[in-house]
């Protein structure tokens, strides 16, 4: 969808250790694809605006790591700034696409929350928490924001649209 992609920048709240792990895995995967990778370390809300200074000269696209605190709270601002800089964005949760992000691929959080409720129910009925097997997410959603794609001058290939779980107009 982004044919000119050679330089990928990863943005994340590095105060969150899971984000640090996510960035490490993304860095390795991007390098394996031959992409030049840079990182934007966000620690507080004020870092978001500063992060975009000169970013267009250093990046072809932006991957925004999922974070329940700083990044999620500023997702609309991040996507607005990225769109202003003509930078396509990729995210790990659909709510970021609702906030103007180009694409997301990640676990279906409502499904995960329902599964969590099932665990709570089992525990309240007497099951021992330590005896309940750990589960990994089983449903992942690909979401594409066509309005953002158009604003960036990008076209989503028909095959990609056919794979999408949701297309936001």
Language-model region placement:
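Short hydrophobic alpha-helices and adjacent helix-cap/hinge residues
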Residues: 1-169
